[in-house]
Amino acid sequence: MDLHNIREDYSKRELSEADCADNPIEQFERWLDEAVRAEVNEPTAVNVAAVDGRGRPNSRMVLLKEVNSEGFVFFTNYHSRKGRSLELNPFAAMTFFWPELERQVRVEGRVGRLAEKLSDEYFESRPYQSRLGAWASAQSEVIPNKAVLVAKAAAVGLKHPLHVPRPPHWGGYIVIPDLIEFWQGRPSRLHDRIQYRLLDGGWIRERLSP
């Protein structure tokens, strides 16, 4: 399949240092708010990349559930491939892509588990069927067919018809950033790239060549 001619010239916006907040979390919140207001498809979807014990990278899309002064929060099964990778090598890279705005954001940092209380609170906010699924799915494990999964979810529902507690193998992670890069597409591939690096407890802002 020849894909050489699939290209687009970016021209919607530009990103100057004067446009950027001093703190990258504040800058991210600005861009995320603009993505939401622009009705970008799945604005909180983010690719999370991790590296397992053999040095093999793996990545997938998850949904960002919170951003705060500490970092970026998502939830998952701790026994999944990403969960096992993050336990062995507690660093991750995240990429947000908002093509409607010709923007992407890269985040790198150390990963830690959220406090159980916070995971409990979020789990309680999930729809009932989603809570059943968290118990039924041995995420990333091979299963013989979908019927097995459906039957397990039904069994959990019979056991917990009203209240589904959080499984001990399910909860939140926070990516505590030490690098955040903002990318804005520009004409002639002369894209704007503004990077923030954490150095001695403070953020350094610098422009990168595209």
Curated annotation (Swiss-Prot):
One of its GO terms (molecular function) is pyridoxamine phosphate oxidase activity. Transmembrane segments: none annotated. Binds 1 FMN per subunit. Keywords: Flavoprotein, FMN, Oxidoreductase, Pyridoxine biosynthesis. Its EC number is 1.4.3.5. FMN binds at residues 60-65, 75-76, 81-82, 104, 139-140, 183, 193. GO terms for biological process: pyridoxine biosynthetic process. Substrate binds at R7, E8, D9, Y10, K65, Y122, R126, S130, R189, L190, H191. Its cofactor is FMN. SUPFAM superfamilies: FMN-binding split barrel (SSF50475). PANTHER family: PYRIDOXINE-5'-PHOSPHATE OXIDASE (PTHR10851:SF0), PYRIDOXINE-5-PHOSPHATE OXIDASE (PTHR10851). Catalyzes the oxidation of either pyridoxine 5'-phosphate (PNP) or pyridoxamine 5'-phosphate (PMP) into pyridoxal 5'-phosphate (PLP). Homodimer. This is Pyridoxine/pyridoxamine 5'-phosphate oxidase. The lineage of its organism: Bacteria, Pseudomonadati, Pseudomonadota, Betaproteobacteria, Neisseriales. The gene is pdxH.
